[in-house]
């Protein structure tokens, strides 16, 4: 349900976040959908999850592993028992910078004040609600908050053939994921910390 709300909000950005300085806000959503693939060990769990998706009218469909290559010829379905895919243009990804810029512009128009500066310590703040937006640096300000920085490596891959309509694809048997980005692809895996010896460009 939260995802449905987010989707509806994203689609309404041109109206909801329109400002005098930013009359045409957008998050540049790419509605290629999500394709998630599961092995036999997670199939039953995913069938149950799919029932929940249907109850929420998410539009998620089940695809048998044996049928995958007929729909997505570039997919090797070896070891895949089942997959889920949403093909109703309701799922995809956005440009986070453009989205945050639109939110900031609207907040300023509504009276928000953005103060640039470096906060090195906090003594006492009286407020009903405090939101920390320090991200991975949160622990420097709030030592008791269990947030620590962690580096993740995402690869940009260029292939001879580009498939712009490809969905964001996740192979849950390996954890590897990828999606198109411009004329290339972004790809990653659970093992997201790599030795520089293997990731640095060749001399």
Annotate each PLM feature.
Residues 88-120:
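Helical element adjacent to the flavin cofactor pocket in flavoenzyme catalytic cores
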Residues 36-52, 106-114, 120-124:
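Feature captures the FAD/FMN-dependent oxidoreductase FAD-binding
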Residues 198-203:
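Conserved small/polar residues in nucleotide/adenosyl-binding loops
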Residues 35, 150-155, 174-176, 183-185:
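Small-molecule pocket liners
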Residues 1-71, 175-177:
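Dinucleotide-binding Rossmann-like beta1-alpha1 core, especially the glycine-rich loop
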Residues 35-40, 85-91:
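Short beta-strand and adjoining strand-loop segment in the mid-core
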Residues 160-194:
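Mid-domain catalytic core of redox enzymes
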Residues 129-167:
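Central helical "cap/lid" subdomain
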């Amino acid at each position: 349900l939260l995802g449905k709300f987010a989707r509806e909000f994203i689609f309404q950005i041109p109206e909801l976040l329109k400002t005098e300085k930013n009359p045409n806000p957008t998050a540049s959503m790419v509605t290629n959908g999500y394709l998630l693939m599961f092995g036999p060990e997670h199939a039953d769990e995913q069938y149950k999850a799919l029932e929940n998706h249907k109850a929420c009218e998410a539009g998620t469909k089940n695809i048998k592993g044996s049928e995958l290559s007929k729909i997505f010829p570039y997919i090797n379905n070896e070891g895949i028992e089942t997959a889920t895919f949403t093909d109703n243009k309701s799922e995809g990804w956005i440009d986070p910078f453009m989205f945050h810029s639109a939110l900031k512009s609207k907040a300023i128009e509504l009276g928000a004040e953005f103060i640039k500066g470096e906060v090195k310590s906090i003594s006492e703040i009286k407020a009903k609600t405090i939101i920390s937006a320090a991200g991975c640096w949160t622990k420097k300000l709030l030592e008791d908050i269990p947030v620590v920085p962690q580096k993740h490596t995402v690869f940009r891959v260029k292939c001879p053939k580009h498939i712009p309509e490809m969905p964001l694809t996740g192979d849950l048997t390996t954890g590897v994921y990828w999606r198109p980005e411009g004329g290339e692809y972004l790809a990653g895996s659970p093992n997201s910390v790599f030795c520089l010896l293997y990731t640095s460009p060749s001399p």
